[in-house]
Amino acid sequence: MGQPAKVLQLFKTLHRTRQQVFKNDKRALEAARVKINEEFKKHKNETSPEKIKEMMKLGSDVELLLRTAVIQGIHTDHDTLQLVPRKDLLTENVPYCDAPTQKQ
């Protein structure tokens, strides 16, 4: 896959992730859309392969961070926030063990 195709794929992936992470939050969806588009437009004339690779890494890191670390919260009262976790954020809650057992 050529570099322009990889850039386009990252662009689309970021937008898909944005839609999942900020689902039902019009303001956040719009802000993320504007920021993604702005950053890609700002660097659209970049020709240096090293610089493009560096920006692709940054974009991939941002996508991973959005997907794994951002959680929505809804104000239900003036001092109450209801968290809305996505299924991919929920992991098995394994209790901590001070004395691990040795494998036989």
Curated annotation (Swiss-Prot):
GO BP term, pick one: mitochondrial respiratory chain complex III assembly
One Pfam family named in its UniProt record: Complex1_LYR
Keywords: Chaperone, Mitochondrion, Phosphoprotein
Keyword Transport: no
Domain of life the protein comes from: Eukaryota
Chain positions with Phosphoserine modification: 60
GO cellular component terms, A-Z: mitochondrial matrix; mitochondrial membrane; mitochondrion
Cell compartments where the protein resides: Mitochondrion matrix
Protein's job: Assembly factor required for Rieske Fe-S protein UQCRFS1 incorporation into the cytochrome b-c1 (CIII) complex. Functions as a chaperone, binding to this subunit within the mitochondrial matrix and stabilizing it prior to its translocation and insertion into the late CIII dimeric intermediate within the mitochondrial inner membrane.
Subunit details: Interacts with UQCRFS1.
Family: Belongs to the complex I LYR family.
Protein name per the record: Complex III assembly factor LYRM7
Gene name in the database record: Lyrm7
